[in-house]
Amino acid sequence: MTTTVIERATAQYPERRSEVSMTETKQDGPSITVLVVDDEPQIVRALRINLSVRGYEVITAGSGAAALRAAAERHPDVVILDLGLPDMDGIEVLAGLRGWTEIPVIVLSARTDSADKVEALDAGADDYVTKPFGMDELLARLRAAVRRGAAASADSDDPVVVTSSFTVDLAAKKVTKDGAAVHLTPTEWGMLEMLVRHRGKLVGRKELLREVWGPSYATETHYLRVYLAQLRRKLEDDPSHPKHLLTEAGMGYRFQE
């Protein structure tokens, strides 16, 4: 058990998480979402406290199935993944993630054998930290993973895309129309973001489903019709005659500026 981490977390922040103000916890610029996957409540609590107080948004999952579902629904920026999960091995979770996303994954495990580390890294992990761990070291590795993830996903084009009907700020994850912010659900944003990042290009239906919903949804094409209709109602001047969110019959979808 990682008593050093737990004791440090509870001593520094004893049951005071709700007292931390938004101004104290918010980072400058877009917030970073971290998915913590671990079935040990004390580890999860320590990570939640230490990450939240530094401005990270934290979501948690106690099983492999819950982790894959959370990743598909919430699109975290980084995943901290334990290998010893109750329903499946963490390597299986890693394989599931790598089937559709390249988000940075830091393995946090009690397995110390070099063979376990090699297996995880070969399966697509970006880093490997063993338990018990020092919080300062983990935070440094997390910052490095965030930097690598940002560099990998950086688009050489302007991250602000302006159309005649609405504006999409990819870096800030915001959409405005007629000067007002448009509220999008996480799934709506995920679909719009992928289309905008591939603007002018056809995005296939299976590719879009895998990226936004996850690999197990690759045949659920009706999801695309429903969510594209919602996006058109929110963003297009004339949803029945869209100019920017276009359907390529039988193939996929295209974003046109």
Q: Where in the sequence are the language-model features?
A:
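Conserved acidic segment of CheY-like receiver
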Residues: 30-42, 47-51, 79
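Short, Lys/Arg-enriched segments at the junction into DNA-binding effector domains
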Residues: 30-33, 144-202, 206
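The short loop immediately C-terminal to the conserved phospho-acceptor aspartate in CheY-like receiver
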Residues: 40, 57, 83-84, 111
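Acidic catalytic/metal-coordinating carboxylates
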Residues: 62-66, 89-92
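Active-site beta3 strand of CheY-like receiver
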Residues: 74-80, 85
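Positively charged, aromatic-enriched patches within helix-turn-helix-type DNA-binding elements
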Residues: 174, 179-186, 190-244, 249-251
